[in-house]
Amino acid sequence: MGATARSLRLALGLLLLGTLPRGADACSCSPVHPQQAFCNADVVIRAKAVSEKEVDSGNDIYGNPIKRIQYEIKQIKMFKGPEKDIEFIYTAPSSAVCGVSLDVGGKKEYLIAGKAEGDGKMHITLCDFIVPWDTLSTTQKKSLNHRYQMGCECKITRCPMIPCYISSPDECLWMDWVTEKSINGHQAKFFACIKRSDGSCAWYRGAAPPKQEFLDIEDP
């Protein structure tokens, strides 16, 4: 093979390499309804971040230190989790690897859902449900106390486009993306998927506890 041909193949190879997706440089998450985020999480708290620092968290398979961001927090209320208050939250150092950035100083309150690490610690990623507390609707805030838990045996199925259907009675169809082009639409803000007496699940709207008539009804 001549030098010109080798150069062309090398240039083509570099061009193709440059067009490949760089999965390691991006964080991708599937949208979930706030109730799903609650049910999937080990810990759900209302808290403020007091301080942050970078810490070592062991080594990778090559012996290189693994860095994480440690947030010292002030827990205001625990909606789900261990008996011991959460004192520290850990996350990756960059959003490219799903790390979360919280405002520190103790002024901004968050709803934080994530995975327990034991001994007053938890881990969070961009795929967890972490939002400023004051952006939640009244219904969402009240649902954190009991309502969301009532539907953790239900399945919320996101509808990406019409037509879409449920495949079993214990599903609720989440339509926000179709109707509002947003995952933070009406159903996310004002509805919870509740399991009823007959084992089926249905959307329930409002901040008040579901009445017995709703739980006993056979059809949505």
From Swiss-Prot:
Predominantly expressed in the lung in alveolar macrophages and epithelial cells. Also found in brain, kidney, intestine, spleen and heart. The activity of TIMP2 is dependent on the presence of disulfide bonds. GO terms for biological process: negative regulation of membrane protein ectodomain proteolysis; response to cytokine; response to hormone. Residues 27-152 form the NTR domain. Residues 1-26 form the signal peptide. Pfam families: TIMP. The record marks N40, I61, K67 as: Involved in metalloproteinase-binding. It comes from the Eukaryota. Coiled coil: none annotated. Keywords: Disulfide bond, Metal-binding, Metalloenzyme inhibitor, Metalloprotease inhibitor, Protease inhibitor, Secreted, Signal, Zinc. The keyword NAD does not apply. Zn(2+) binds at C27. SMART domains: NTR (SM00206). Residues 27-30, 95-96 are annotated as: Involved in metalloproteinase-binding. Gene3D superfamilies: 2.40.50.120, Tissue inhibitor of metalloproteinase-1. Chain B, domain 1. It is found in: Secreted. One of its GO terms (cellular component) is extracellular matrix. One of its GO terms (molecular function) is metalloendopeptidase inhibitor activity. PANTHER family: METALLOPROTEASE INHIBITOR (PTHR11844), METALLOPROTEINASE INHIBITOR 2 (PTHR11844:SF24). Interacts (via the C-terminal) with MMP2 (via the C-terminal PEX domain); the interaction inhibits the MMP2 activity. Complexes with metalloproteinases (such as collagenases) and irreversibly inactivates them by binding to their catalytic zinc cofactor. This is Metalloproteinase inhibitor 2.
